[in-house]
């Protein structure tokens, strides 16, 4: 499937999922403050929140006194963000063709959006284009290890799902591997001397053993497409297996799922720095 087809698949999926996202995927919000710190967002910072979804990052940035603008490919996501944060600015736009002039933002963030674009390197290059010379990009991507959510879901799908042909898109863990990340950032105009790659872990608390399955089914895109293609008996087997996996993480009256992300940040080339990568 071409990049344009994958982009349309993602756009349509998020249009459908937008009304469920903020209730289902509270896990992404656990990384917002660290993301803003990595992007050096403070009072007065002009922030571009790429793949803004319902506006979690923009909302937190505004609480710091920053001036955020959120952009998302899905109109329904932008409408939801505007409803949640009526005093902030959100626009429909493509991370690969940002509708903003060169050097117009002090910081650019992308909270788990990089895995949802058809050309991740192009998204990095666009972020570089709209950054001021001393600005900073920060983005998150999932780690391949340390994520109970993926381990549980992947095991259930491997055992019970009928194979479904889907679009070819980036890995869920795109740029989490350090060498891949360095190569991409350098090629897109970022200074490796300013690069930081941190691993951030959290516990995602969900109220029921069924929460993860419901999130995957109603508020996801790629996995949701696989689930919707299953016959009823297969879908129920997957649901049951995921619920059993979640129950292993019981914590009082809820469930605490370990999750891990790579937090990556860098400034543009030519902005100064000591030439050494920071960790």
Where are these regions (language model features)?
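Conserved Class I S-adenosyl-L-methionine
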Residues: 3, 10, 27-29, 54-56, ...
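Conserved catalytic/acceptor-binding region of the Class I
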Residues: 121-122, 128, 133-208, 223, ...
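A short SAM/SAH-binding and catalytic strip from SAM-dependent methyltransferases
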Residues: 106-120, 143
């Amino acid at each position: 499937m071409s990049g344009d087809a994958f982009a349309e698949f993602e756009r349509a999926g998020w249009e459908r999922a937008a009304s469920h996202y903020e209730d289902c995927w509270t896990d992404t919000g656990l990384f917002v403050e660290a993301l803003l710190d990595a992007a050096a967002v403070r009072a007065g910072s002009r922030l571009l929140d790429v793949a803004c979804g319902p506006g979690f990052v923009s909302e937190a940035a505004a609480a710091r006194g920053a001036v955020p603008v959120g952009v998302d490919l899905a109109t329904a996501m932008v409408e939801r963000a505007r409803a949640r944060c009526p005093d902030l600015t959100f626009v429909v736009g493509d991370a690969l063709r940002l509708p903003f002039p060169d050097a117009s933002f002090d910081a650019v963030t992308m909270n788990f959006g990089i895995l949802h674009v058809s050309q991740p390197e192009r998204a990095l290059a666009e972020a570089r284009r709209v950054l001021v010379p001393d600005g900073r990009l920060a983005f998150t991507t999932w780690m391949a290890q340390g994520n109970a959510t993926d381990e549980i879901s992947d095991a259930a799908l491997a055992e019970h799902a009928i194979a479904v042909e889907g679009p070819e898109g980036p890995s869920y863990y795109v740029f989490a591997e350090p060498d891949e990340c360095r190569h991409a950032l350098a090629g897109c105009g970022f200074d490796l001397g300013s690069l930081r790659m941190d691993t951030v872990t959290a516990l995602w608390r969900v109220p029921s053993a069924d929460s993860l399955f419901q999130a995957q089914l109603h508020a996801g895109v790629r996995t949701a497409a696989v689930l919707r293609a299953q016959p009823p008996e297969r879908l129920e087997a997957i649901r049951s297996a995921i619920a059993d996996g979640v129950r292993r993480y019981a914590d009082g009256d809820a469930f605490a799922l370990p999750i891990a992300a790579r937090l990556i940040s860098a400034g543009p080339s030519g902005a100064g720095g000591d030439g050494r990568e920071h960790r």
